[in-house]
Amino acid sequence: MKTKEIDFSLRRETLSKLLLDDSVVILASSSTKVRNSDADYAYRQDSNFYYLSGFNEPESVIIIRPSARNRKYIIFCRDRDPLKEQWDGYRAGQEGAKEIYGADEAYSISLLDELMPEFLQGAKNIYYSMSSPNGLELSLVKWLDQIRANKRQGSEVPENLLSLDALLDLALIHI
């Protein structure tokens, strides 16, 4: 385990202690910003996303599910692609997300919409950053609708959508 990984896992653990029971944290990365037709601005990760994960790539989402029975830290990220890496730089991919960044599980970002309802099912509370303009709210509505559609088959629909922003401020104080 690398020192950086220990620091980030401690931050996630500190945040987890502040959450209500049966909660899930979802946080999306910043998106790239286009400078002109063939160049992007230098990438800057969302501060809260980086604070909890250390993961510095766009098109990624982290899930923290700290309940005793399902304690998981999951990263959805881009796949490794040697051709794109030649132009845009290194990508950790799913193996790197686990080995370098300490994720319990890692999946391709292309599987996010397919797998997210499964990860949210059974949680009572969903925490997400309401101050990040990354479109996560629209995706959350879609995922919750998918869970509701399966309610007759026993799916448990989360009850509360809560702001992660104030809790992250408290987590900073407690470290």
Segments predicted by a language model, with ranges:
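A composition/biophysics-driven feature that prefers long, compositionally simple stretches
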Residues: 1-173
